[in-house]
Amino acid sequence: MEPWPCSPGGGGGTRARHVIINVGGCRVRLAWAALARCPLARLERLRACRGHDDLLRVCDDYDVSRDEFFFDRSPCAFRAIVALLRAGKLRLLRGPCALAFRDELAYWGIDEARLERCCLRRLRRREEEAAEARAGPTERGAQGSPARALGPRGRLQRGRRRLRDVVDNPHSGLAGKLFACVSVSFVAVTAVGLCLSTMPDIRAEEERGECSPKCRSLFVLETVCVAWFSFEFLLRSLQAESKCAFLRAPLNIIDILALLPFYVSLLLGLAAGPGGTKLLERAGLVLRLLRALRVLYVMRLARHSLGLRSLGLTMRRCAREFGLLLLFLCVAMALFAPLVHLAERELGARRDFSSVPASYWWAVISMTTVGYGDMVPRSLPGQVVALSSILSGILLMAFPVTSIFHTFSRSYSELKEQQQRAASPEPALQEDSTHSATATEDSSQGPDSAGLADDSADALWVRAGR
């Protein structure tokens, strides 16, 4: 039995050896022997079809007169697949979107692992960027969608969008700029109040349980700042569509940790009452530790600072590099600490390096090129070990720094581009539709638009309309 019905335009022998495929307007004639070397799941299903209905489940159309199978897919992506069949190498083209190319590979039944290493790294990096964009705090699609819905639900969505623009986007207008300026001012006032609360005279009054006008003024100042931060946190929670995602956001967790100490100390003071001094004394250390968390207010500046957001994004993306840096440091520390202890304690009779754990501190300080000078090797073997540890620290810490620097530059450029799109709503809408339009855009372009496929595949292409 033939793999598919006999057509008037094709011969049975030719059909048994070759298959003619039309992908997005470009025709290619493939040999089944090439598919045997690198099988495509969809074309293998095509060969196994026994009737016209089975063919239409695999391809989009079938031309009986030409014995030709039509697929309404991207011709640029399929050109790379033809290069795989001819040369045995699958490369990611620079023209099409990387995510659209991944979808094409899934359609034709090709494993992503067949990509060359450099192309696979590029694809994985693009997938990570897309995942981070989807998990971002602002949903650009919801922001840019026109609010024309009628009724209470439409008015609620419009109100949320306006509130989101004021709270999260300083470039949305005068209200957003004023809100950002007030928020930054309160952060600065909180930092100044935290510094003043550590002055010796105010700390002495706190320990004696007294409340001078200075102490009372600082308490009022802190109360006003906490009230503003609580109000801002409430506004951000109201404009969030998903409360669980809002509470899981890192900056919102920092806000909760910064606000919690004030309310805990206030509740303990109210619960203790006038005669509850013993309860306050027992909880004094805990309260002081909790109040130290007020320094987290400074992290709120990340909402309004592009550099701080870039730093946080870099730390999240370079978690593996930071772990590698820590591993290098620990291995070198475990190597040089016993050596300097042996050289100084046993040979030089120095008491500074009393034990190997005490030498760990010296090893860390030396490899990071800080050099406090509290522990200094005096003997010649100890100085040789010190020189080796310093040089090793410089080399080991330089390896991951290059990758971290490039990641920071890329993160800063991406966030700056997002900020510019947020400042102009119309370009933002066009940019948001770019990723979804890229896959369909490729179908309207010829294979020559990519211009970077393997030249060995050019001989397989035949233009439609002979």
Swiss-Prot record:
Biased composition (Polar residues): 435-447
Keyword hit for Cell membrane: yes
Low complexity: compositionally biased ranges: 448-460
SMART domains associated with the record: BTB
GO molecular function, one term: voltage-gated potassium channel activity
A GO biological process held by the record: potassium ion transmembrane transport
CDD domains (alphabetical): BTB_POZ_Kv6_KCNG
Tissue-wise expression: Highly expressed in heart, liver, skeletal muscle, kidney and pancreas. Detected at low levels in brain, lung and placenta.
Location relative to the cell: Cell membrane
Extracellular topology ranges: 197-217, 272-283, 342-356, 377-383
InterPro entries in the record: BTB/POZ_dom, Ion_trans_dom, K_chnl_volt-dep_Kv, K_chnl_volt-dep_Kv6, SKP1/BTB/POZ_sf, T1-type_BTB, VG_K_chnl, Volt_channel_dom_sf
Residue window of motif Selectivity filter: 369-374
UniProt keyword list: Cell membrane, Ion channel, Ion transport, Membrane, Potassium, Potassium channel, Potassium transport, Transmembrane, Transmembrane helix, Transport, Voltage-gated channel
SUPFAM superfamilies: POZ domain, Voltage-gated potassium channels
Cytoplasmic side: 1-174, 240-250, 305-319, 413-466
Protein's membrane topology: Multi-pass membrane protein
Intramembrane segments: 357-368, 369-376
Assembly information from the UniProt record: Heterodimer with KCNB1.
Family of this protein: Belongs to the potassium channel family. G (TC 1.A.1.2) subfamily. Kv6.2/KCNG2 sub-subfamily.
PANTHER family (UniProt xref): POTASSIUM VOLTAGE-GATED CHANNEL SUBFAMILY G MEMBER 2, VOLTAGE-GATED POTASSIUM CHANNEL
Extra remark: Heterodimers with KCNB1 are highly sensitive to inhibition by tetraethylammonium (TEA) and propafenone.
Protein name listed in UniProt: Voltage-gated potassium channel regulatory subunit KCNG2
Source organism of the structure: Homo sapiens
Top-level taxonomy: Eukaryota, Metazoa, Chordata, Craniata, Vertebrata
